[in-house]
Amino acid sequence: QMSYTNPVLLKTLLISLVGEAGILPEDITAYDVSRLFPDYMVEMCTEEILEGVHFVDRRNGIADENMPINWSYEFSGAVNYLPTCVTEAEYLINLANLKGHSYGITLCGKNHFGSFINGNAMRPPEGANLHQFLTKNEMDTYSPLTDLMANEQLGGKTVLYMLDALICAPSEGASITEETARWRQMPFDGSYT
């Protein structure tokens, strides 16, 4: 499978929210408006007590045109809007997946690249012209991740940050297999995360 969040971890989180916190499944939305949720994940995370949990991805995400993202740095790119599933939410849980990445370590920060909509449905961050800012390793360099985390609707509503590090892909877009899930760098030294 491609490097999506582990459906077992997502399902466990959802069961905890419904079974222990008493949140109604229909009041829960899992979203990433830059990707597609695989059918197996949606099915696994909406069965039994989770029936009614919503999934919003690039096919059904709706831009809240009253909520454009205001970047603190001026650059050219598409206007970006938060999805209505974010602006209508009372709070967020940021569940990201650990994986190797050519842009360096971002953990939960880059997860919000799945939190905005613009004219490029396939790759909103490219439509926004954001990747250019992630390749620089210099101090005092602008990072759009800071703006996303500081956004009142994103960072301001986030009550929990979680990182799925159970079985991780070695890079973005890589399939997770027995061979690729073993990380070569320290401290893993050819073992699993």
Labelled PLM ranges:
Residues 2-193:
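Extended, low-polarity segments enriched in aliphatic/aromatic residues
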